[in-house]
Design a protein with these regions (language model features):
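Hydrophobic alpha-helical bundle signature of multipass membrane enzymes
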Residues: 1-682
Length: 682
């Protein structure tokens, strides 16, 4: 509990001068709350130091690399220095770092005056655009955002994340296996994945085979005892299992909360629209004032993956900007497959999914938290305060702050490489061309490869990549890149949904997941999640006219999905488990975050830890905003870890009270720092 009753301010008449003083007192109290949060030491996995000068799993994208794909140490050191060095007051930061190929400056690239690359790093592009346009270079996205401050909520240094899984760990092997499996299941319907079926295997792997193979891995096999896990690692492992402690098709690729593991894979908030009857909500059209939002999405073309050869992989690591070459499918459909969800999270706006969910709940009459002073009585309606405008604005407020907070983790602390990089290191060991990898690195990567092969993933990945290369070559000149490495027909590179690969920022934490964690926390805090004002029984989706779960239709032509006729309408879901509003909101956060894993650009831990970072950013903002209300206000929700969280304001003080899943009180400061190593000494 965090209680600021010592900083009470006196009630005064509403005279102009007195109001000004009271406003200042409130701001001072908010500053005291902010000062009470101890800066947290975020632990790292130590690989940037342990693997120095090689950095097989660090984020090196955009920097000069040698012909084997290893970064120039001089450029990497310059990159880290440019990220971490303090600002100079009154002067802009040049961020003068080598960017892109150094064999002749590519459009958008950069060669600092002080940087003189050795010949092995002065390389050019390997591929060319078929349309004849020059390949250009992408810039890093907000690499200095970790130095920016905010005036609401915890500072970016006050909330920590756990260390990312390290090379050699069972956890890293498991989450690399998940990303490989998702790449091969991109065109398999979610309903088939949740059922663990065998009907569809367009890339050589069925949902059942994926489940069986993943279950062979120690981290995902509940019967295997793993010694030496930290409590945090044990929590992440337990999140892969159901309530009985089993790994099942229903938990495979799902989020870490009970709601995310219940019912159909996709949250109803990604599918349904608004309306007064099921026939209307199944149209998937959301009322947005005088406009309408259609839940159908434009998708990437099915069956087309990228970066399956070393040449295109290499150019992407050098920062090639080829996003405009992505092939799209015709028409719009309801999200039916992992590729379609990946398509959504490639182009979605920052808080789009949560805005849509908020609109659905608003129009369907979900009602706000019973602890609000407006909206529940006869004479005061909620609008500017505790109403729709208040809540919708708050979603955007927390989203931007969450995004800046996770940028500090990404660039300033972890600098974790993307899955596409780890897969390339696995491929190097598998192909017998390890390059600069040390003996210890080779041994760890070899063990990972053998475990991935035991899971039944390496052979179908190699076969799929070979088939993709052959298809790209046979497309009558329509594939947008030339110069692909067709000689590497058995690569174990990660097939990517996006032609440009991952974004130009590190993997850990994940921006989508952090924003999801923050925005869904606001939705759970603002809308009434429970059946009674003093109870914790969750409200069902029935209460907002969405009781019958739906999923997109799937039309099959033998063992193939007919994508032209699938996803055209919503039908009754096979799984009709009764769903709760809070559970579907938690599932929405998981869908958006793990949708990035389906594209191949993130790991599971990126989702898990970032979700909780965003949640804490939102709670600290809500805590401070409680000071601005001159009368009693409260809001409550269940956290992603299952804690019961109550935020209260009395009109002159604020408190945050938390009870864990076991019913015992949890210290608020300890809750905020749950992922931290230890508080930073003052």
């Amino acid at each position: 509990m965090d209680d600021f009753r010592d900083y009470e301010y006196l009630a005064r008449p509403a005279a102009t001068g007195d109001r000004h003083l009271k406003s200042c007192e409130i701001r001072e109290t908010a500053a005291l709350i902010a000062a009470s949060r101890a800066p947290q030491a975020t632990p790292t996995n130590g690989e940037e130091t342990r693997h120095a000068e090689v950095w097989p799993l660090s984020f090196t994208k955009g920097l000069p690399h040698d012909s084997d794909g290893f970064v120039d140490p001089k450029a990497f050191h310059a990159f880290v220095t440019a990220i971490t060095e303090p600002d100079r007051p009154g002067l802009p930061h040049a961020f003068d770092v080598p960017l892109g190929p150094q064999a002749g400056l590519a459009p958008g690239g950069n060669t600092p005056y002080s940087y003189k690359p050795r010949p092995e790093y002065a390389l050019g592009w390997r591929c060319t655009r078929r349309d004849g346009a020059p390949l250009t270079v992408r810039a890093w996205e907000s690499p200095r955002a970790g130095h920016v401050y905010d005036l609401q909520g915890a500072d970016a240094s006050d909330i920590a994340m756990d260390a990312a899984p390290a090379l050699g760990s069972e956890e890293l092997t498991a989450e690399m296996a998940e990303v490989y499996a998702l790449a091969l299941l991109r065109d398999v319907p979610f309903s088939e994945i949740s059922a663990g079926g065998t009907a569809f295997a367009p890339a050589g792997l069925s949902a059942h085979a994926a489940f069986t193979g993943l279950g062979r891995l120690a981290f995902l096999n509940a019967r295997t005892v793993l010694d030496g896990l930290t409590p945090r690692q044990a929590d992440r492992r337990a999140a892969r299992f159901d309530q009985t402690g089993a790994f099942t098709p229903q938990t495979m690729f799902r989020g870490s909360t009970p709601g995310a593991q219940t019912g159909p894979y996709l949250s109803q908030f990604l599918l349904v629209g608004t309306g007064t009857c099921p026939q209307e909500t199944r149209e998937g059209l959301i009322s947005y004032g005088a406009n309408t939002i259609d839940q159908r999405v434009a998708s990437l073309a099915p069956g087309v993956d990228h970066m399956v050869d070393f040449n295109s992989w290499f150019d992407v690591q050098m920062g090639a900007d080829i996003k405009d070459l992505q092939t799209a499918d015709a028409g719009r459909r309801f999200i039916t497959t992992p590729r379609q969800l990946a398509s959504y999270v490639r182009v979605d706006q920052l808080y789009q999914a949560y805005l849509n969910a908020a609109l659905v709940l608003l129009v369907q009459g979900a009602g706000f938290d019973s602890g609000f002073p407006e909206g529940t009585g006869k004479s005061r309606a909620a609008f500017a305060t505790f109403g729709g405008p208040h809540m919708l604005a708050l979603i955007s407020e927390v989203s931007s702050r969450a995004l800046k907070a996770v940028r500090r983790q990404k660039f300033n602390i972890h600098r974790r490489g993307r899955p596409e990089r780890l897969a390339a290191m696995v491929d190097k060991v598998a192909s017998g061309a390890p390059g600069k990898l040390t003996t210890a690195m080779r041994a760890q990567l070899r063990t990972m490869y053998l475990n991935l092969d035991k899971a039944g993933l390496m052979a179908p990945v190699a076969a799929h990549n070979a088939a993709q290369l052959a298809t790209h070559a046979a497309r009558d000149g329509s594939y947008p890149l030339t110069g692909l490495g067709h000689e590497a027909a058995l690569s174990h590179l990660l097939p990517m949904a996006f032609i440009e690969g991952s974004p130009m920022h590190p993997s850990y934490g994940a921006g989508h997941a952090t924003v999801a964690g923050a925005c869904v926390t606001v939705l759970k805090a603002f809308f009434e999640m429970f059946t009674t004002p003093d109870g914790w029984t969750e409200r069902l989706m029935d209460s907002v006219g969405l009781g019958c779960s739906v999923e997109p239709n799937v039309v099959a032509d033998g063992a193939k999905v007919d994508f032209d006729r699938s996803g055209t309408k919503l039908v009754d879901a096979t799984d009709q488990t009764r769903l709760t509003i809070q559970g579907e909101l938690d599932k929405l956060a998981a869908n958006i975050a793990i949708g990035r894993d389906m594209a191949g650009v993130h790991f599971y831990t990126d989702y898990y830890e970032s979700l909780r970072l965003g949640e804490r950013m939102a709670v600290t903002i809500l805590q401070e905003q409680m000071l601005t209300y001159p009368e009693p206000v409260s809001m409550r929700f269940v956290s992603y870890d299952g804690d019961r969280v109550l935020i209260e304001g009395t009109g002159h003080a604020v408190s945050v009270t938390i009870f864990g899943k076991n019913g015992r009180p949890v210290d608020y400061a300890a809750w905020l720092s749950r992922a931290a190593q230890a508080p930073v000494p003052a």
